[in-house]
């Protein structure tokens, strides 16, 4: 490919004429863009590259903000391993309450609307119910 480019550039430079620096680049550019088909090819490549770049940006943005997504485990209301406080705020289940629903949070979350201000976090609530029922001790 480089040999073809240099041959086409050499056609525009007169024999015995020595050009150094920028003029030789101008001759190479003129050689590459003189052919209408090559110019159309370069324009198509540029448009395709731009479209691919925009598609990648869109996919990355969509993966960071999925529709109807819920934030899990990133706020102050999650229970860490080893903690024993239960029922101390609105996001935890108290000792006397019972869990209504399936034990698979993924299937349950698909049918529920996104979290609002008055909703509990279902995954956290189920984990606490399982911990209480199985009496799992996380302390070392």
From Swiss-Prot:
Region (Disordered): 66-118
Compositionally biased intervals (Polar residues): 68-103
Superkingdom: Viruses
Chain coiled-coil ranges: none
Subcellular location: Membrane
GO cellular component terms listed in the entry, alphabetical order: membrane
Membrane topology: Single-pass membrane protein
Main location: membrane
The keyword Transmembrane helix is annotated on this UniProt entry: yes
Keyword line: Membrane, Transmembrane, Transmembrane helix
Annotated transmembrane regions: 44-60
Protein name: Putative membrane protein ORF7
Native organism: Ictalurid herpesvirus 1 (strain Auburn) (IcHV-1)
Gene name of this polypeptide: ORF7
């Amino acid at each position: 490919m480089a040999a073809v480019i240099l041959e086409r550039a050499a056609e525009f430079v007169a024999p015995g004429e020595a050009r150094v620096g920028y003029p030789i680049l101008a001759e190479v550019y003129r050689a590459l863009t003189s052919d209408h088909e090559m110019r159309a090819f370069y324009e198509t490549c540029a448009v395709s590259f731009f479209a691919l770049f925009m598609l990648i940006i869109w996919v990355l943005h969509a993966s960071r903000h999925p529709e109807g997504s819920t934030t899990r485990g990133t706020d102050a209301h999650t229970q860490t391993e080893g903690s024993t406080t239960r029922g101390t705020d609105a996001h935890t289940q108290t000792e006397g309450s019972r869990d209504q629903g399936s034990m698979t949070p993924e299937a349950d979350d698909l049918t529920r609307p996104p979290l609002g201000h008055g909703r509990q976090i279902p995954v956290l609530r189920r984990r606490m119910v399982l911990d209480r029922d199985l009496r799992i001790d996380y302390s070392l």
